A protein has these predicted regions:
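Conserved N-lobe motifs of Hanks-type protein kinase catalytic domains
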Residues: 17, 65-68
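Protein kinase catalytic-loop region centered on the HRD/HxD motif
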Residues: 135-147
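A short, low-complexity linker immediately N-terminal to eukaryotic Hanks-type protein kinase catalytic domains
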Residues: 1-11
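Cytosolic eukaryotic protein kinase-like domains
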Residues: 27, 33-60, 71-127, 163, ...
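Catalytic-loop of the protein kinase fold
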Residues: 144-159
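Protein kinase glycine-rich loop
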Residues: 11-22
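RING-type zinc-finger domain of E3 ubiquitin ligases
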Residues: 306-365
């Protein structure tokens, strides 16, 4: 990792977050070369023995999570003196940088390969990215044990070169443990995670994180994407428009081209997800189909994946050659049995993966996603 980043050179730094700094690496000997390159996250200081044990536990948890819209963890270097996490490099930048377009944001985008400032994201592009992140978050919540992200924000949603969205930085997530044989729906902690403006008042008051507090942060992210403004104080600043969603076009970012209908529906989702009283909040499972419907109405259809994106999601070293009963083709024939040993449900849509309906080299050459109507029971794009 030191060699791949030129000694963690400043010229290769593409970002900085709660875990530490992020550096661009073009190639790593132990991983298949990919055109997008790699992002190496390194802790600012040594983690120590206790921190190392916590990080090892976190890595084991994240290794069991696999979804097309969840940024995959490709490799780790865990040592008390320096801890590093390796991910694919998302050259489209973060949703936050693409929305705010500040001098610092544009500098980070230049480090990712943008020669000039990219145009503002359209409403359709924003909806598509938000939908992708919501899919990944809902997937984390359906795992057993459940994984809470606890740091959802526009800065933790990344874009690839084709405009697909990926939920990143699940490094602060914790697996919710079963108590007395029952699955718990929340997680209490003395440590407060999250960014200012995105943190649920429930967490600030009693430290109790849940699917609903993740949903609150997603609701704020929807509002950030709608307005193009920073999250801090945004909910109260938009209070009038949120009380009357049919006026939400008045707070919509002009450069995105939001329609009145899009702004109104997005405002209603914000209100549902970020309602002050927890008992009246909208579950993410209810909000996701409505986001799907917005994307479908906007015509924001995914581009066909290229050959590189058709590589196995687990080893990244062989083409996808196994198609599950649900329609997803995610793994090569060597890796598919390893995935099914952990769970007989498809990691992407949680539908039964068995029986395997197709195998062989031809799977990767076929169209790898099929859109379903939001009215269908399971709403996802099949990769």
């Amino acid at each position: 990792l030191i060699a791949a980043t030129d000694g963690f050179a400043e010229a290769r730094k593409v970002g900085e977050g709660g875990f530490g700094r992020v550096y661009r690496a073009d190639a790593l000997p132990s991983l298949p070369r990919v055109a997008c390159g790699f992002a190496v996250k390194t802790a600012l200081v040594g983690v120590g023995a206790q921190g190392l044990a916590e990080l090892q536990s976190e890595v084991r948890t994240l290794s069991a999570a696999c979804h097309p819209s969840l940024l995959p963890l490709l490799g780790v270097c865990l040592a008390p003196s320096r801890a590093c996490l390796v991910y694919p490099l998302c050259r489209g930048g973060s949703l936050e940088d693409r929305l705010y377009r500040s001098p610092a944001a544009l500098q980070r985008l230049r480090m990712l390969g943008f020669e000039t400032a990219p145009p503002p994201l359209s409403s359709a592009a924003r909806l598509r990215v938000l939908r992708d992140a919501a899919r990944a978050l809902h997937y984390l919540h359906t795992l057993s044990p459940m994984i809470l992200h606890r740091d959802v924000s526009a800065g933790n949603i990344l874009l690839d070169e084709r405009g697909n969205g990926y939920l990143a930085d699940v490094g602060l997530a914790r697996a919710a443990e079963a108590t007395a044989g029952a699955q718990v729906s929340h997680l209490s902690t003395q440590r407060i995670f999250g960014k200012p403006g995105y943190m649920d008042p429930i967490i600030l008051n009693d430290g109790q994180a849940s699917q609903l507090t993740d949903g609150f942060a997603l609701g704020i992210t929807l509002l950030v994407a709608l307005t193009g403004r920073g999250a801090l104080g945004l909910l109260s600043a938009c209070d009038d428009a949120l009380e009357e969603p049919d006026t939400a076009e008045s707070i919509a970012a002009a450069d995105a081209g939001w329609s009145a209908a899009q702004a109104e529906e997005l405002a209603r989702l914000v209100v549902g997800l970020a309602f002050v009283r927890k008992k009246k909040r909208m579950p993410l499972a209810e909000a996701l189909p409505r986001l799907e419907a917005l994307v479908e109405a906007a015509g924001a259809v995914e581009e066909t994946a290229g050959a590189e994106e058709r590589q196995c999601d687990l080893c990244y070293d062989a083409p996808r050659s196994v198609r599950f009963a649900c329609g997803h083709a995610l793994y090569c024939e060597a890796c598919a049995p390893r995935v099914l040993e952990r769970d007989t449900n498809c990691p992407a849509c949680r539908r039964p993966a068995l029986p395997i309906v197709d195998t062989g080299a031809g799977v990767a050459a076929q169209t790898t996603f099929v859109y379903q109507s939001p009215r269908a029971r399971h709403n996802c794009v099949y990769w």
